Amino acid sequence: GTTCPYVFPFPASPLLAARMAGAVIDTAVLDRSIETLRQRHEWLLVEAAGGLLVPLQEHLVLLDYLAAKQLPLILVTSPRLGSINHTRLSLEALRARAVPLVGLVYNLHGDHPREIVQDTLVECRKALADYGFAPNLVILPDLAESSAAAWPVLVNAARSLCA
């Protein structure tokens, strides 16, 4: 379909999942879906699977596709172990490929020690500055997964990043 042009049964990297399904991810299909949705909607959020450097094709990773299309990115991070490193590596890769960063979402889903939450938040703000990105950071509180009350929080977070 237009909103999700590829769905594969095996939960793996896009390249492996496509291979296992006997398919190839065609970026022209992605391009058509994105363009169709851009024409229909004021806002478009393209959610990717697997991370910035996950392969889409044999010689194409997601981030290179995003860079070629100059699609602005919202990076989501958390206070989990390893997230400072993951966030810094991601910001470095974005800067190296000149991918525009709309902002950073700090997702507090789950139970995390207060000290780690605070330290990781400080480090995320520092990383944005260190890599030359605007300090657009939204803290997303832990929301019940299927709660209708969560939608206003998510909409406000999106608006604050896209303002």
Which residues make up each language-model segment?
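Glycine-rich nucleotide/cofactor/substrate-binding loop typically near the N-terminus or early
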Residues: 1-13
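Phosphate-binding/switch loop-helix module in NTP-utilizing enzymes
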Residues: 13-56, 63
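A general structural detector for well-ordered alpha-helical segments in enzyme core domains, enriched
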Residues: 33, 62-65, 90, 120-124
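Structural motif
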Residues: 45-47, 74-76, 105
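Inter-motif core of Ras-like GTPase G domains
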Residues: 57-80
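Class I SAM-dependent methyltransferase SAM-binding "motif I" and its flanking Rossmann-like core
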Residues: 83
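C-terminal lobe/tail of nucleotide-utilizing enzymes
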Residues: 92-163
